[in-house]
Amino acid sequence: MKVLVADKFEESGLTGLKALGCEVLYEPKLEGDALAGRLAQTAAEVLVVRSTKVSAAAMEKATGLSLVVRAGAGVNTIDLVAASARAIAVSNCPGKNSVAVAELAWGLILALDRRVVDQAVDLRNGVWNKGEYAKARGLSGGTLGVVGLGSIGKEMVHRAKAFDMRVVAWSRYLDDSKAAQMGICRAESIFALALASDVVSVHLALTKETRGFCDAAFFGAMKPGAIFVNTSRGEVVDEAALKRAVAEKGVRAGLDVFEKEPSGATGTFEDDVVSLPGVVGTHHVGASTEQAQQAIAEETVRIVRVFKATGQVPNAVNLCHRPPATALVSVRHRGRVGVLAHVFGTLSAAGINFG
């Protein structure tokens, strides 16, 4: 099995893939037309990516491609519709970077509450201003609002208890019973959450429904001077509305993600939101700890191992996991003429309905 790794990837992961008997092509700077070309040239069966975009054009001539593994959680950089149309499975590594992202989110919260960045800049410029920086509000006794209660959101809740904070959360799948089990309060809406929270942390996957989710009405409901943190995807926030909230309500923002980010590891960053007073930004590195990347590498190897051995795809995001049928038949063959016809004929002869 030929595996093309088109992003930076842990050495242990490359070793693990080779140990499976895979032919590993490690080309961590592929993107755009170059990626499309290499997929066509190599006839790779598996593509592993982190931040590289996998477009419909990239998959169009990738005749050998059967599986795309996103070495991370979010899959918004992969054209799922195009992949599904070409019978290419897409898998991810959910939950493996949850602790890392939660740690950065809390780092941003603390940095905003204690104005750590402003203090560091003043000290570097030879300015001592203890009187100004002694005005921090503090976190203990306050309310943390968590928007999205997946694995990262749950890690946020766990750490909030150490800060003696009350937690109110909103999720489509959260009910009062689950909230009670977690020792938190369920918000009826994101607006109710915004009204109640001293700190809001967003942990949403980017979908058609969540694009621009935190909008003008949401920021209008936030408390003046509250803290807003986004470590999910830049597109879930209406940035113009956020800028107004910063300027008009003194909302402080910690952002690890932005709607327009450079496509590579380095580049020019032109989003002026980070120049606003009260805004702290980082370089979309929430998941980028050694611990998280090691866990993701191990999960990627596991996914390829299972796929190579059985044809099944762990963590598939574009396959139906619970079809209406009572059984699933998976046929792996070498493209020989008549194989599927024989299988279907055998099923029909046995009176088995299939689709």
Predicted segment positions?
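Phosphate-coordination loops involved in phosphoryl transfer and adenosine-cofactor binding
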Residues: L65, S140-T143, A216, G225
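An N-terminal-biased, well-structured beta-alpha scaffold segment characteristic
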Residues: M1-S91, L195, D215, T266
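A conserved regulatory-domain signal marking ACT and ACT-like small-molecule sensing domains
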Residues: P314-G355
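Phosphate-binding beta-alpha-beta segment of Rossmann-like dinucleotide-binding domains, i.e.
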Residues: R86-I88, P94-T143, S151, E155-H158, ...
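Short, Asp-centered acidic motifs that coordinate Mg2+ and/or phosphate
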Residues: E45-V46, L67, V199, I227, ...
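Short beta->alpha connector loops at strand-helix junctions that form conserved
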Residues: E27-P28, R50, A71-G72, A87-V99, ...
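Rossmann-like dinucleotide-binding domain for NAD(H)/NADP(H)
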Residues: V90, R166, P224-C320, P324
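Rossmann-like adenosine-cofactor binding region
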Residues: A40, S55-M59, Y173-E270, S288
